Regions:
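Charged/polar, solvent-exposed surface patches and flexible loops
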Residues: 100-103, 207, 249-253, 317, ...
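Low-complexity, flexible helical/coil segments
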Residues: 121-127, 145-152, 176, 201-208, ...
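Conserved active-site and cofactor/substrate-binding residues in soluble primary-metabolism enzymes
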Residues: 11, 15, 19, 80, ...
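C-terminal substrate-binding/catalytic lobe of Rossmann-fold NAD(P)-dependent oxidoreductases
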Residues: 18-73, 162-165, 169-170, 175-303
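N-terminal Rossmann-like NAD(P) cofactor-binding subdomain of oxidoreductases
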Residues: 2-178
Length: 344
């Protein structure tokens, strides 16, 4: 029987959207994608080089409305013909678009990114995959939420069975290497949003684990630094029982995590630029394995967190599960084998 082919739309061509398009192009055959459509709000002269590069690879790029850019397909033209939507806008735009998507009876599914909480079931690859199978709308949690949840998962168990409590400090880079809008000139501390959980990172981890019926006693704080390279997280995890395996053994058995003996984020970032597809690192987090503090029932340390590479991998996984892609486990294993590394 011939496998179904999908027409997909990437709505938003910022950092996440364009990086996602590159992944979809690379794995177009494996994901059974017939056509990739994309929507961009505006077309400036200095952006046309990249647009033309993507168009040369077969991506059909339209605009948000028929009147905004002449002679280009609009979102209105594309919505009736696509099977799946990768919502890559931010700052509440995706939540506004959800109202339209919910009226599309033919639409198999859609996913949105970290800032669009409430778009659907909060999701991260390797954590709650069973909860989004055949779900129409999924919210892929942020890159730093990925990092925090992955550390809890590897050291305390998939259901957090060995977690007593945890505290994490997220050290954020201020802006992607290719942008400048959100750069800061000095360290900026984030406001705690919850008197117990702290910043949105722990709130989002807690809410994601609620989809599994699991309580997550996690607190987080957040500081943004004048860096454009990688995030980092300092973790302090209190265990119910001491680890029965070494951290190295645990991480080796968790394909979404990686290790490094390097202390400089710029060195790790440069390796990703050289050897990662699209110059990116896709692990949920990279643990500084030679710098852990372990005492009885406590494990403390640092991990680097890639920018949006980890969320892109979860976004691809969400698509597979939402549309019930044929042989999705085998396809995802191939993608993970291609993109993930044991050490950096």
């Amino acid at each position: 029987m011939e496998k179904k082919k999908y027409k997909v739309l990437v709505n938003g061509m910022g950092n996440i959207g364009t990086s996602l398009i590159h992944l979809l192009l690379r794995y177009k055959n494996e994901l059974h994608i017939e056509q990739i459509y994309a929507v961009k709000r505006s077309f400036k002269d200095w952006q046309m080089t990249e647009i033309e590069m993507l168009q040369a690879q077969g991506v059909i790029i339209g605009t948000t409305s028929r009147s905004s850019v002449p002679n280009r397909p609009s979102l209105e033209d594309q919505l009736p013909i696509v099977d799946y939507i990768f919502e890559a806008t931010a700052n509440g735009v995706g939540l506004e678009n959800l109202n339209t998507y919910q009226t599309l009876d033919h639409l198999l599914g859609a996913s949105a990114q970290g800032s669009e909480k409430g778009f659907g079931t909060s999701f991260m690859a390797g954590i709650n995959e069973e909860k989004i199978k055949n779900q129409r709308f999924v919210h892929v949690v942020s890159c730093n939420t990925h990092g925090s949840a992955a550390l809890l998962n590897v050291f305390t168990g998939k259901g957090l069975e060995n977690l007593q409590s945890a505290d994490m400090v997220v050290v954020r880079r201020s802006e992607d290497i290719g942008n400048h809008q959100r750069l800061v000139s000095a360290n900026v501390v984030a406001r705690h949003l919850d008197p117990i959980a702290g910043t949105h990172h722990s709130i989002d981890v807690i809410d994601m684990y609620k989809t599994l019926g699991v309580e997550c006693p996690l607190t987080s704080s957040d500081i943004t630094t004048p860096s454009q390279l990688m995030h980092a997280v300092r973790f302090n995890i209190q265990l119910k029982e001491a680890l029965s395996e070494t951290p190295e053994e645990l991480i080796k058995n968790q394909p979404f995590l990686s290790m490094t003996k390097k202390f400089d984020s710029n060195v790790v970032f440069e390796l990703g630029r050289r050897y990662g597809f699209g110059g990116r690192i896709y692990e949920h987090a990279i643990v500084l394995i030679s710098n852990l503090l372990i005492s009885n029932k406590t494990i403390k340390g640092w991990a680097f967190v890639p920018q949006e590479g980890n969320t892109l991998l979860s976004t691809i996984r969400a698509f597979m599960l939402q549309v019930s892609l044929t042989d999705h486990d085998a396809v995802f294993l191939k993608i993970k084998t291609d993109l993930l590394k044991e050490q950096w």
